[in-house]
């Protein structure tokens, strides 16, 4: 009886809300009934139907708006123009560094002056111009102005130097480069290798002797440029908007293509899915050269009229003071930032704010509840999605630890799937028919999304490098002849359809026959050592199978009670997960999104001839960490030291 009622509910939702054809509804109900497992299906239905209906309605709303934008050939500048008309004198952007406030009218005029100036210098629709500067209001005005002209901005990571920086500028085929005065030394380092035809413009404080000789000071040139809207380029909703570069931790950075529809989709799904409001004020301390800061954050300003507070860089000590000063209601985060905030000593400001939502990704389950309760944040809005991916997820109901969900009842509505992979090689595991094998609840698998190029929500725009595209696409995934985007991320789905981020490729290693999760160990070590930054990775040891765990901890003073640490480890971690080697260094290098860079740490290993920082190893006989000198290293290499 209950099962029948549940199926009737699904039927009504599928037909009346999703407007699916009767044949698809009928087959779906049949398969659901046969595979429901009786009471389990009823339990899942009761616990998830409200969530699934809300998620379905959000998806339908965004789809409808996307179709309208497609028909009317709207672009981000056109959508921004309608925002300006709604409230021209409302504050759009606030730059915390100088307390500079820009209204929507001022942002519109600045971006139009950028478009008119570049047009006067010969740039046209389809050309590329690079932006290389730290966070500030002008960053937004620059790429928006380029978009008004149809020029595609290449947003360069400000941490890049020399070869990597030159690679990004060269592969983008930029005709012009706008750099902040704070980046002048980095440009001088590669100036001799740049294309002589590349126009250079410096924004910010002007010191002619600190920039390449051909550089022009942009700010006065923009002041003299017309502030009216230039003639609209022949651009549509699926045309290129700008390029965002990958972090480059596994090689040289790749330019991911962001089209207008992708920018809108990413911002809109977050806005409607997490129930944002036009009067919300967002605190955005994430890099604007990445999608989280520029699309998820700034997108709410340009498309939905919200005020965004921009900070040059994240500061744990100033975070809550800024939120109070600017009356922020939403803060953006990535997982590491939350840990930095929790490591700060308690203070009154952390409970005097008006923040109602923390929006971001990568918040570890182990600190989720502590973060939410300590800082009194009612809603943690966790989402999943890389710049180029077509299978974004949202945790719309704040399920602790989940990065999103997919309906177990109506899974066909959103064509994503977890498929079995060899977790060491990430090779897809296929059945006898050649199709990828879907994972069952509780079974880890790689997240994939079906590619449908005609659907802006399902398309894959990829990278400028076609070779990089081929590595991210697989065929015959859902069915014969189809294509799917490979995220490279391993997730796990529970019985209710919630998805949990397991580990990014390479974030596990095998030791003593067990898989060790670096993220879990890092969280434990960070707490025990009272260090904000701890990197855990596997290193090869001659004569042993797998990789031994090694931890690098950042301690400016170098002080660490290793005897107490070893005792605490015994209580906290199983033997196989305890790091064999320790490295204490002044600081750990991070990417622009505060992810720890482990590649060089792995390469250097535990050889004291290479590593000049203090090294220790876990002496199995003594049960504590002892100094790793050249003599001990030789014994380990010869297999004379038990690990």
From Swiss-Prot:
Signal peptide: none
Enzyme Commission number(s) of this protein: 6.2.1.15, 6.2.1.3, 6.2.1.-
GO cellular component: endoplasmic reticulum membrane; plasma membrane
Protein's GO biological process: long-chain fatty acid import into cell; medium-chain fatty acid transport
Keyword Flavoprotein: no
Coiled coil (residue ranges): none
Any Pfam family matching the protein: AMP-binding
Gene Ontology molecular function, alphabetical: arachidonate-CoA ligase activity; long-chain fatty acid transmembrane transporter activity; nucleotide binding; oleoyl-CoA ligase activity; very long-chain fatty acid-CoA ligase activity
TM stretches of this protein: 20-42, 139-156
Localization in the cell: Endoplasmic reticulum membrane
PROSITE patterns found in the cross-reference section: AMP_BINDING
PANTHER family in the cross-refs: LONG-CHAIN FATTY ACID TRANSPORT PROTEIN, LONG-CHAIN FATTY ACID TRANSPORT PROTEIN 4
Entry similarity comment: Belongs to the ATP-dependent AMP-binding enzyme family.
Protein known as: Long-chain fatty acid transport protein 4
Protein's gene: SLC27A4
């Amino acid at each position: 009886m209950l099962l029948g009622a549940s199926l009737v509910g699904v039927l009504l939702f599928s037909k009346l809300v999703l407007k699916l054809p009767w044949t698809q509804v009928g087959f779906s109900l049949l398969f659901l009934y046969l595979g429901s497992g009786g009471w389990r299906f009823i339990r899942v239905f009761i616990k998830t139907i409200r969530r699934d209906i809300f998620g379905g309605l959000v998806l339908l709303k965004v789809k409808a708006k996307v179709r309208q934008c497609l028909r009317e050939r709207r672009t981000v500048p056109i959508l921004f123009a309608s925002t300006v008309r709604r409230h021209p004198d409302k504050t759009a952007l606030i730059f915390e560094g100088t307390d500079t406030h820009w209204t929507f009218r001022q942002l519109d005029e600045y971006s139009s002056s950028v478009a008119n100036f570049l047009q006067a210098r010969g740039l046209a629709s389809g050309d590329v111009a690079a932006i290389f500067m730290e966070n500030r209001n002008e960053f937004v005005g620059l790429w928006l102005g380029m978009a008004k002209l149809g020029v595609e901005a290449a947003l360069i990571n400000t941490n890049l130097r020399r070869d990597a920086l030159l690679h990004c500028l060269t592969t983008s085929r930029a005709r012009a480069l706008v750099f902040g005065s704070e980046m002048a030394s980095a440009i001088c380092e590669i100036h001799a290798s740049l294309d002589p035809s590349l126009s250079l413009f410096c924004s910010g404080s002007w010191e002619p002797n600190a920039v390449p000789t051909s550089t022009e000071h942009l700010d006065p040139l923009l002041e003299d440029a017309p502030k009216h809207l230039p003639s609209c380029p022949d651009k549509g909703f699926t045309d290129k908007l700008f390029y965002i570069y990958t972090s480059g931790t596994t090689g040289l950075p790749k330019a991911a293509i962001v089209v207008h529809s992708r920018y809108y989709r990413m911002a809109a799904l977050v806005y409607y899915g997490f129930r944002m409001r036009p009067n919300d004020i967002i605190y955005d301390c994430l890099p604007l050269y990445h999608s989280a800061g520029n699309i998820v954050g700034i997108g709410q300003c340009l498309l939905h009229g919200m005020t965004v507070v921009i900070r040059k860089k994240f500061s744990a000590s100033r975070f809550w003071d800024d939120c109070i000063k600017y009356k922020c209601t939403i803060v953006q985060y990535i997982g590491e930032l939350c840990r930095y905030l929790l490591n700060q000593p308690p203070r009154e400001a952390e409970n005097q704010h008006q923040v109602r939502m923390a929006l971001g990704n990568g918040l570890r389950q182990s600190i989720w509840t502590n973060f939410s309760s300590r800082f009194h944040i009612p809603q943690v809005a966790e989402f999943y999605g890389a710049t180029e991916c077509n299978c974004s997820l949202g945790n719309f109901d704040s399920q602790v630890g989940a990065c999103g969900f997919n309906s177990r009842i109506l899974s066909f509505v959103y064509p994503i799937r977890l498929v079995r992979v060899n977790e060491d090689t990430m090779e897809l595991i296929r059945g006898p028919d050649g199709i990828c094998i879907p994972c069952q609840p509780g079974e880890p698998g790689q997240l994939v999304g079906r590619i449908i190029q005609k659907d802006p929500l399902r398309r894959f725009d990829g990278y400028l490098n076609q070779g990089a595209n081929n590595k991210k696409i697989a065929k015959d995934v859902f069915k014969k002849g189809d294509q799917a985007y490979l995220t490279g991320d391993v997730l796990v789905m529970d019985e209710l359809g919630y998805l949990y981020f397991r580990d990014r490729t390479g974030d596990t290693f095998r030791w003593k026959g067990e898989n060790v999760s670096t993220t879990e160990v890092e969280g434990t070590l960070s707490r025990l050592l009272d260090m904000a930054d701890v990197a855990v990775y596997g290193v090869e040891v001659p004569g042993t199978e797998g990789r031994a765990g090694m931890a690098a901890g950042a301690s400016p003073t170098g002080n660490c009670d290793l005897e107490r640490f070893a005792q605490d480890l015994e209580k906290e971690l199983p033997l196989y997960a305890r790091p064999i080697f320790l490295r204490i260094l002044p600081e750990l290098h991070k990417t622009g999104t505060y992810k720890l860079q482990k590649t060089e740490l792995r390469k250097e290993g535990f050889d004291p001839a290479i590593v000049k920082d203090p090294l220790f190893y876990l002496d199995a006989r003594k049960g504590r960490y002892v100094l790793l000198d050249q003599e001990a290293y030789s014994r380990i290499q010869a297999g004379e030291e038990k690990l």
